[in-house]
């Protein structure tokens, strides 16, 4: 699945599933937790939930006698792509992974890429664009660090980011483009803490340790001009990994889309 409360029979999933079925490939699609026929509660960006559900789906396939247990693969799109390597590694019984709109960089980099293009689409550019992205990166990185080490809260580094927020707000408080189209950073890091509680596992997520431990074929399919996924950064990492290891990586880029 991509991000959001998506059902098993949504248009993107249905198209891919039907294509695989026509080639004789059995497909298991499931509603996200808390969506459709699935139990539980859906939580945005709950990667820990999504990983556990994916592992359970693999275990279910392994319990069936009509499935070739040596040929079980994963196909993840966007958000599904970033967690697929962890599912494959922890389930210990996945033969291959296909990544559609693949993500091979950490979630902070992916979020910043998406926010950059959202702001460009709203007419934000130049120093205002660069300053806002830089500040968002500082906020994300400090909040992630604070979850790893609570002592970071109210540290000198924490207050430096607070000062950056104040400086940005003062610099652009009269900027009409930002007032109309920009996002609000609040007045201090503490204003972000409640929001961050709900997305901490997603913002701090990094698929690379799992990718690097996998020893199975992986296909990454990218759109050259994807505004949600940083194609160039992901491809650069994957090519370097392939060059310096024996990884079975196939990288495909669809041009001009």
Predicted regions and their residues:
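Alpha/beta-hydrolase active-site loop
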Residues: 44-65
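Short amphipathic alpha-helix adjacent to the substrate-entry channel of hydrolases
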Residues: 8-27
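Accessory cap/linker subdomain of secreted extracellular hydrolases
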Residues: 100-210
